[in-house]
């Protein structure tokens, strides 16, 4: 039986129902929505190439957004579901800004849809029952080439697929990587509006879903 967790977003944000176990129909529907948006904002050829780089339709459709149970986002299909919500939040946060401070919807959607794609490759199911039961590790880390962060890997995948970024889009693609960086204080604390919108949307995802 599917497990529902419903939440209401402040400031008249939309309501979403996140399931810890998604039916096949929901998985397919979410993937279809994600792919359609990806084609809209990066182009059909680029979108197809990205999905292929990530392992194909099934890999993206079934991918998790996180690895531990306490995040509330470590389940099959959470990647597309969460990224769709992230895109909506980011656009609505932008709408709350004074008009002269707002950034383009196209750039917001592009970055929101692409900035986490590295996670599709990053996680694989945890096969250690003890770690699953005692540590809540539903997924573990896959062995990937290069010691690079999610945002950096996402940029690499997108650019290898023909996607081009403006300076502000490139910065925003890495904004969540910067949270744990101490050396690059300037770029961490003096980021553009697009980066701040994406950062706030990511923080909303965490607050809404994290188990306390």
Language-model segments: which ranges?
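All-alpha helical catalytic cores of prenyl diphosphate-utilizing isoprenoid enzymes
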Residues: 50-59, 74-84
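Non-catalytic interface/linker regions that flank or bridge core catalytic/transmembrane domains
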Residues: 7-8, 16-67
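Divalent metal-dependent catalytic cores for phosphoryl transfer on phosphate-bearing substrates
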Residues: 67-81, 88-89, 93-99, 103-211
């Amino acid at each position: 039986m599917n497990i529902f967790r419903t939440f209401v977003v402040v400031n008249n944000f939309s309501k979403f129902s996140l399931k810890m176990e998604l039916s096949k129909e929901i998985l397919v529907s979410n993937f279809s929505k994600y792919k359609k948006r990806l084609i809209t904002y990066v182009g059909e050829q680029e979108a197809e190439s990205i999905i292929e780089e990530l392992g194909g339709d099934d890999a993206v459709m079934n991918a998790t957004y996180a690895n531990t149970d306490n995040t509330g986002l470590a389940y099959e299909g959470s990647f597309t579901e969460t990224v769709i919500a992230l895109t909506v939040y980011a656009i609505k946060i932008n709408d709350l800004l004074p008009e002269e401070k707002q950034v383009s919807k196209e750039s917001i959607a592009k970055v929101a849809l692409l900035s986490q794609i590295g996670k599709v490759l990053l996680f694989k199911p945890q096969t250690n029952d003890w770690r699953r039961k005692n540590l809540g590790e539903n997924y573990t880390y896959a062995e990937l080439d290069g010691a690079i962060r999610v945002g950096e890997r996402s940029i690499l995948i997108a650019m290898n697929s023909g996607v081009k970024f403006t300076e502000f889009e490139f910065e925003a693609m890495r904004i969540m990587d910067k949270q744990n960086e101490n050396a690059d204080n300037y770029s961490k604390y003096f980021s553009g509006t697009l980066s701040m919108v994406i950062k706030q949307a990511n923080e909303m995802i965490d607050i809404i879903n994290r188990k306390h």
